[in-house]
Design a protein with these regions (language model features):
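Hydrophobic/aromatic ligand-binding patch that stacks against planar heteroaromatic rings
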Residues: 7, 27, 210
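Glycine-rich phosphate-binding loop
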Residues: 16-28
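A structured beta-alpha segment of the ubiquitous adenosine-cofactor-binding alpha/beta core
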Residues: 1-13
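Conserved C-terminal structural/oligomerization subdomain of aldehyde/semialdehyde dehydrogenase
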Residues: 138-210
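Short glycine-enriched loop/turn motifs at secondary-structure junctions
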Residues: 10, 38-40, 70-74, 162-167, ...
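ALDH superfamily catalytic-core signature
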Residues: 25-155
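Short acidic loop-to-helix transition motifs that present clustered carboxylates
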Residues: 1-3, 23-24, 203-204
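Short hydrophobic/charged patches on amphipathic alpha-helices used for structural packing
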Residues: 4-5, 57, 181
Length: 210
């Protein structure tokens, strides 16, 4: 870290792009050199009412399953209006997602985070089948593409609000787009403030609002 700190403060360095842990990002911001930093983050994706739902789900699942979810910019959670939840779940299941029941959600939630609240490295880049076996989930069908867990809160005690570098998604709902926007902001400020947000919509007014 000392060598990295010296490099960031060097007079020939004009700009720093810091990615990785929060300590690295803090060091970049305090170096005195202009810096753009991104630490861990739970990037949410909003499936707005006007979206092409099959296409939006395909894009999210393709993104989240690429390299078994190791890309930090891939979706970490999805969110939709409450009255769309059934349709979203049905389409996700049609395309290979497996929604955990309450007991499975609790079991996997205890596995994906360590006691200190950090991500369990055993999930990183692992397949759904491997994660299911490691976590003791014996009802996940062979060939499931992602594991999806319903989540309501953000922060400690809500493991699916954390970054998950594996084929695991949190699933949130909001009363309407205003409620969704508030939850999205809460998610984004929990880890890696302002990390990544995406929205699937065909309504330009929704784009402007967010």
């Amino acid at each position: 870290m000392e060598a990295t700190d010296n490099l960031m403060r060097h007079r020939d360095v004009a700009m720093i792009l810091a990615t990785g842990g929060s300590a690295m990002v803090r060091a970049a911001y305090s170096s005195g050199t202009p810096a753009i930093g991104v630490g861990p983050g739970n990037g949410p994706a909003y499936l707005e009412k006007t979206c092409d739902l099959p296409l939006a789900v395909k894009r999210i699942l393709d993104s989240k399953t690429f390299d078994n979810g190791t890309v930090c910019a891939s979706e970490q959670s999805i969110i939709c209006d409450e009255d769309m939840a059934g349709a979203v779940q049905a389409e996700m299941e049609r395309q290979g997602a497996y929604f955990l029941d309450d007991a499975e959600r609790e079991r996997l939630g205890r596995f994906i985070l360590r006691a200190n609240g950090t991500m369990n490295p055993e999930i990183v880049g692992r397949s759904v089948d491997t994660i299911a076996k490691l976590a003791g989930l014996d009802r996940v069908p062979a060939g499931a593409r992602v594991l999806v867990a319903r989540e309501t809160g953000v922060g400690r005690g809500h493991p699916y609000s954390n970054e998950k570098l594996g084929p695991i998604l949190g699933f949130y709902t909001g009363a309407d787009y205003r409620d969704v926007c508030g939850k999205v902001c809460e998610i984004l400020h929990y880890e890696g403030a302002g990390h990544t947000f995406s929205m699937h919509t065909n309504d330009d007014k929704m784009v402007d609002y967010f």
